Design a protein with these regions (language model features):
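Extended charged
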Residues: 72-278
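Histidine-centered nuclease catalytic patch
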Residues: 2-77
Length: 278
């Protein structure tokens, strides 16, 4: 039997905790069984809570007694601070990030390296949800996050910092890091990653592999519902599997181009929802 809670239970636990760890408010969470799973394979929301990976590790190893767990559950950090929608609260209904002068707008995978979805974005119930797959220099999968849920990986080597609309994950040796600032739109995104034994850097200037900048061959465009595909030899772009109606928006003014891309994304999303309903 899978330990992953049903969607309705998971949603209730996230909402009651203010979309963050009950103990500290971090937006990257795991689902914790206060009444231990080993003795009772249950999904009772009253006996579960959400914790960040480090507090979850403490709780499962006995360093956080049940009474303390229940105090955190009854008084979640974000709720006490008036952050009912968590630290990654956003008001927009779309995701956008800049890579050089190119803006990607949509939801789902934004960057894929050597066939792996490295970075994805979604809009949750008023908050930004990120997905990450981060690899070591030897191409070992170090961590996986799916829509703000820590799926796999040892949390101890990682420094996770969060502030209002900001999130940083940094590996202890500082060889790998990802940070985002969701205050501006498009979001500001930076990353120092490894894939296939090569170092990949992502920032507002573009994408760099082992120090060499990857030319897009395009400038001053918005890619709507499109994912960047990177391998060790080339960079390309194409429709995300989730967004078959992808388009490219060309407009001289960057702010107006973003608005036009946003409107196109809303049209695409309506088409996808309509097709799924058939």
């Amino acid at each position: 039997m899978s330990r992953k809670p049903p969607a309705a239970v998971a949603r209730q636990l996230r909402q009651e905790a203010g979309f963050g760890c009950c103990a500290c408010g971090l937006p990257i969470i795991q689902y914790h069984h206060i009444v231990e799973w080993a003795g009772d394979q249950h999904f009772r929301a009253q006996d579960m809570m959400v914790l960040c990976p480090l507090h979850h590790d403490q709780a499962t190893k006995g360093a956080m007694p049940e009474a303390e767990q229940r105090r955190f559950k009854a008084n979640p950090c974000n709720i006490q601070r008036g952050l009912a929608q968590g630290l990654l609260k956003v008001s927009q209904d779309y995701c956008a990030a800049n890579f050089g002068s190119v803006t990607i707008v949509g939801e789902g995978p934004f960057v894929r390296i050597d066939g792996e979805n490295i970075q994805s974005f979604h809009i949750g119930p008023g908050n930004l949800e990120i997905s990450l797959r981060l690899f070591s220099k030897t191409d070992e999968l170090l961590l996986e996050i799916d829509r703000n849920e820590w799926i796999s990986g040892d949390p101890l080597p990682w420094d996770i910092e969060a502030d209002w609309q900001k999130l940083t994950l940094r590996e202890s040796s500082r060889q790998i890091s990802v940070s985002l600032n969701a205050k501006p739109v498009p979001v500001e995104l930076k990353g120092e990653l490894w894939r296939g034994g090569k170092r990949a850097s992502l920032d507002a200037r573009g994408i760099h592999i082992d120090g060499a900048t990857y030319p897009f061959g395009i400038e001053e465009l918005a890619l709507v519902g499109i994912v960047l595909n990177i391998d060790t030899g080339k960079l390309s772009f194409g429709a995300s599997p989730q967004n078959p109606y992808a388009v490219i928006v060309s407009w001289p003014d960057r702010r107006e181009r973003l608005w036009k891309a946003r409107d196109k994304w809303r049209e695409i999303k309506a088409k996808v929802l309509s097709a799924d309903a058939r």
